[in-house]
């Protein structure tokens, strides 16, 4: 017989629990650290490698030529950069001019939380119109996490994902008329239930110990988890698992205790590198398959690709991700076509220069966002030994490797337990600002990661030694078309 306690026993009743922000349930510093470490982990992984200029990369020797005026006017990889003179530069919707990212341009100072509410509401309405959203919240007595997600103990991961997605869209939090924002009980509980039941170790603990066993599990803020981690998986066939999502997945899968975050960060680098290698191999093979599909029927191929792209728009950040992937595909395809189709012409490496410019801009954005993350952590998390149990425990363990001072260790645990339950008193406006900054930073880090990964995979596809030059040429042309279709969709 299961020892699982009901949610109601732990004061988590859907019907009776008073609505309040998730921050009042879990310390702000705890939530911040859970998410921030993911971004810092990705930044550390990125910095372990050299930032090579694209000028050093060639696809079997890159030949170049000058673009004709006509080609300049019609080629989006060229016109969407600041290398082209444009009197209406401020009207360029793609915003790749100077150091401004596409995401910043589209938002144009708009509240990112408001933007996400609008996008998720639209996706939910589209799903209802298309008769996709069938999942209903359990209207009976909600006794446990399984009831919250309307599943049972034997439901597979796909059912968990589907129900979590549909129910989260149904209960996505709204901004009130006075511009205040508060996460609702249903949305909170859906996220917490999913973050426990979708990871086997956590699920086993819950099945054996009930909600009590989840008390000290790290739970990422529901809004950040849904928009920044979960929904990116809807585009998995094109972008794989992002580095941020992979880190969070490792962290939750292994049910790492908060006091072990620092050591886990160091240990996870190797796993993240292996995961990234697998991601690139998988995406390279998937891209080959997509480009080779109906190789002799371009019209049928384009219709299938358009249908796939339409499905990709079901993610709240899809506009930004489609632009990142589309621009990269189009640019890499152009680099290859210029080297092979026009090898006898003089060319100044325009597409390579465009890529260099874009990559340098991405690195600048990445550095800026990592610095912003550090600033947030300093503000909301105590990085001093006197109040930080992680640093204190690490120092204690280091100084006492030769002997077991159990009483002292127990006292450290008591201090940690007290700090675990401590809340930082910050205003609702500060809560809102914190969420805004975290969402913006995670979005930008994800986009930098996606572009770098997709570029590597696209190169691999066009350097595939198992096929001949005619296949390479066909793939490059289709890659260019695929990129253009994605860019069109991102602009709708």
Curated annotation (Swiss-Prot):
One Pfam family hit: DnaJ-X
Report domain J positions.
144-210
Question: Known CDD domains for this protein?
Answer: DnaJ
**GO cellular component labels:** membrane
Q: Where in the cell is it found?
A: Membrane
What biotechnology does with this protein, per the record, is: Possible candidate for an effective malaria vaccine as determined by epitope response in sera.
* TM segment ranges: 30-46
Which UniProt keyword terms apply here? Answer: Membrane, Merozoite, Transmembrane, Transmembrane helix
UniProt key word Membrane: yes
Its membrane topology: Single-pass membrane protein
- PANTHER family found in the cross-reference section: DNAJ HEAT SHOCK N-TERMINAL DOMAIN-CONTAINING PROTEIN, DNAJ HEAT SHOCK N-TERMINAL DOMAIN-CONTAINING PROTEIN-RELATED
Protein name, UniProt field = Uncharacterized J domain-containing protein PF3D7_1401100
